[in-house]
């Protein structure tokens, strides 16, 4: 008789990945450009209001007053006078246009723009974005967008039936905006500071040490866990770009806090390296979980060259009312705890509840992040 497939709980698959992540391994070094950014060198958000035309009857209805007013205003600038109340075009949609202005973008550079309907248009497919000024937070126009809108979904219907895929009321215009104004930033005139993407005292200290070892003492100073201040040597004052490029290529061993991420909805459990449990006992409904530490002694053979060493042996076990006991290896990790609950058929909700209780008791040496 063929073997019957064994059902796998929702979070069983995630345990393999979590266990692999928890295996101690030498920390990999990363380049500085993956760990930090130069303060002031960043993208800037742009936005604008525009019209998309050429829609096949899927635009805004006459109930969207601002679309009627926008169409009338546009025609008025072209010398055509019309009352907004008389606008009855369903092939026009009012949209909000957004873009990201890259650092050091020069006039003439093309950037992508995103468009999203503001009214009751059903789809922007096949539409054309008219000339739209894109301003920054200071109100100045930095780019102008225009072009055909690409939509990743569709909306079709007839006779009361409707078929929709993805979100056809938003889309993109590839290279649809031309930069008209550059953001003023004089690299080298302002103090040079590297901002860590994941603030950490150890990482900041290691980064400063790596820079000083490469370019000389006093070149870098860790100001706080998130910032490293740079002081170019006198010979590099006029070569700030080369100075920063050399620093970006340095490799630094980044450090981070131990963290456990769980999702109650999917049952996913991800634990990083260094996550451990302290001795604790937890009772949750019919489940009982115990993690304990026993003293042990490593005794060498008689007349051997070794010496007696004291050690500890960590054990964890989980039981269910009316069920058996699942013993774990001589370790006390989140992966072993999750695997024990998995063997007992516990639900993802049970796993999340147990981990939260262990954290509240101070027995989880890591941050616990619960995803929605």
Curated annotation (Swiss-Prot):
GO terms for MF: structural molecule activity
Keyword Lyase in record: no
UniProt entry keywords in alphabetical sequence: Bacterial flagellum, Periplasm, Signal
Cellular component, GO annotation: bacterial-type flagellum basal body, distal rod, P ring; outer membrane-bounded periplasmic space
Pfam family, one: FlgI
Domain of life: Bacteria
Signal peptide start-end: 1-29
InterPro entries: Flag_FlgI
One GO BP: bacterial-type flagellum-dependent cell motility
PANTHER family: FLAGELLAR P-RING PERIPLASMIC PROTEIN FLGI, FLAGELLAR P-RING PROTEIN
General function of this protein: Assembles around the rod to form the L-ring and probably protects the motor/basal body from shearing forces during rotation.
Family: Belongs to the FlgI family.
UniProt cross-references to HAMAP family, sorted A to Z: FlgI (MF_00416)
Complex and partners: The basal body constitutes a major portion of the flagellar organelle and consists of four rings (L,P,S, and M) mounted on a central rod.
Name of the protein described by the UniProt record: Flagellar P-ring protein
